[in-house]
Amino acid sequence: MHAREWIHGVYLGVVMLVVSATAAGQTGSVQTFVLDNVTGIDARNAKLEPAKFQGKKSVRLTTDARDGGLAILHGSDLQDGTIEADLAVKTTTPPGVRMPGFTGIAFRARPDGSEFQMFYLRPKNALSDDQGMRNHSVQYVSEPGFGWYRLRREWPFVYESYADIQPDTWTHLKIEVAGRTARIFLNGSTKPSLVVDGLKSSMLHGAVGLWGYAGEESYFANVRITPAAAQPVKNGADAAGEWIVRYASDAGPFEGSMKLTRDGSKVTGTWSGALGENKAISGTWRDGYVELAFPADWPEGRDGAPGPAAAFLEGWFDDSSAKGRMRVEGRADGRWAAERKVH
């Protein structure tokens, strides 16, 4: 969330929140956190208090930490399933923030808060007459490594969206997590406000947390965690080999092949197909997640000037298949999918 909108790898203030839960810790059981008290709280760089906001019993989270505070629900755990919660933010004007008001729910988090993924809301952005700011109403981050700034610069408007939400009032949130995909639904809508297909973290399960921003008041109530059957996803798939790639972009479809080799975290290889022949690929691998780049040749007959262009791919490999996002700088954006070529 802008220079102080969200974290840049700086340690978060973490609060370990102990609450009563229904069948807490039992795999396959629903966990309910009413959040009407703060018994057993260990607060660091954040403060939790029982409160009423607009007549609803809740927990109020405040923090003076520049990059916000996180409260982990003790005993919570989810791989795949849904998280529901009521949340609200009392907006103030932290220094340097153009549109104040941040609050969110973290998932698949480490108990110490050192790694997590999160959807967060920015209700005042939804009221802006600047469409660019309106498109930042709901955002996704994965920390460490994939904060708002990096995701927005590398993949504009893919990890954030507009939503019809209001500041200083309760919002009902539901997050659906399935494998490497997560969706957020707001205020009972059956249509997601944001879909992240290709979650950035290799954490496949973890705790649920509450997040608030410096200088503001975030309120949380009625967290309900409902597990579902886990998707058959695993980490560590190798990218090495030959892959047949299909790229569905806003400039039309493209096809090609990648021949990749891997040495530790380093990936090299070649691309051949619609965007050029024997183009040198370079990039990185982490637990099956790759970020690759190669110099492309933009063809005649497509929107945009023909000629040299830079192509970028990111995504996950899962044994015999792979998928993610791809862009050709200044020319096209979309999703790619690949199948391993069997010789």
Regions found by a protein language model. Give the residues of each.
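N-terminal secretory signal peptides that target proteins for export/translocation
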Residues: 1-8
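Intrinsically disordered, low-complexity proline-rich regions
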Residues: 8-12, 98, 288
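Central antiparallel beta-sheet cores of small beta-barrel/beta-sandwich binding domains
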Residues: 234-343
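Extracellular glycan-recognition regions
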Residues: 26-238
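Bacterial N-terminal signal peptides
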Residues: 9-21
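Short stretches within intrinsically disordered, low-complexity N-terminal or propeptide regions
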Residues: 5, 23-25, 48, 73, ...
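Generic C-terminal helix-cap and adjacent flexible tail
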Residues: 4, 229, 341-343
